[in-house]
Amino acid sequence: MEFEKIIPASGLAAEQCGQGLTVDGSVLAAFTEQAFKRLSFTFPQEHLESLVDVACDPASSENDRLVAVKLLENAVIAAKGTLPLCQDTGVAQVFAWKDAGVCTALTAAGGTVHFGSDEEAFTAGVGKAYKENNLRFSINIPSSLFDEKNSATNLPAQVDIFSTNGAGTGTAEYAGSSCSNGTGSDSTEPSYRFLFCAKGGGSSNKTDFTCATKALLNPQSFERFLKTKIAALGTAACPPYTIAVVIGGLSPEQNLQTLKLATTGYWDAAEALNKIGGSIRWTDTAGGVRPLRCRDWEERVLQIAAETGLGAQFGGSHLAAHARVFRL
């Protein structure tokens, strides 16, 4: 996952204030809207390249190549900004990491209240993106224990804001990527970092959580486990997939949150920063303990996915394009 700058709309800005950074709530709403519009109409370069690889791979089945070519054709059409990549828009998720040196201005200069909280600002941006870009409203809300109805707004969004310890002076940068991502460029400056995930970050309904004993933690048992779970994914979630596996953790919640971030490439960025002497706040999901990336098992996951024969929907070897395996 690569970070890149995006610029807030004209007239909206974040500014240095004393020893910290003040961000107007309207900025949060504006680039949340920008992020979800972008996610609805454009693929990240990495994904496009993986589709090209499938289409050009001599080992690909005819069906694999057909799917890859059609997805690339759809990407060209969607990039024009009228027809989205997929009408199954799903849950909008926002993850944010807010340094102690950052405050949000939720009222206008005249005292008019824009938003009651950062969460409301993010939610407003999500709602506007789905309404103004003719995206499908696919969120159901309960009317009773057994009955539900469409919210007709694609809200509520899932918004998780984490408090982090960064402080200092300077300005933040905004960024966007596949799931759209943001960070300050200098670890000595306060920053407000964002991760936007459309469709629940992929297909959340394919998430599987298993409580097991240590008997699973040997190569033979673990491989049998993976073969069963990967085959059970099927093709309904529109492969080629990114398959992420996280083993261990202090709680189910920690495991699943680490898993979600693994699918977005968040931990890839963390690993890269660590290698070049940078810093990242691992405590936001891993309790101060770095997830151990297991690259050899990532290769095995891709092999197992290929061996299912499911392919990119209609038979072949390209069920998965990427894999991430972490141990907590």
List each language-model region with its residue ranges.
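Non-transmembrane, aqueous-exposed alpha-helical and coiled segments at domain scale
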Residues: 1-170, 174-328
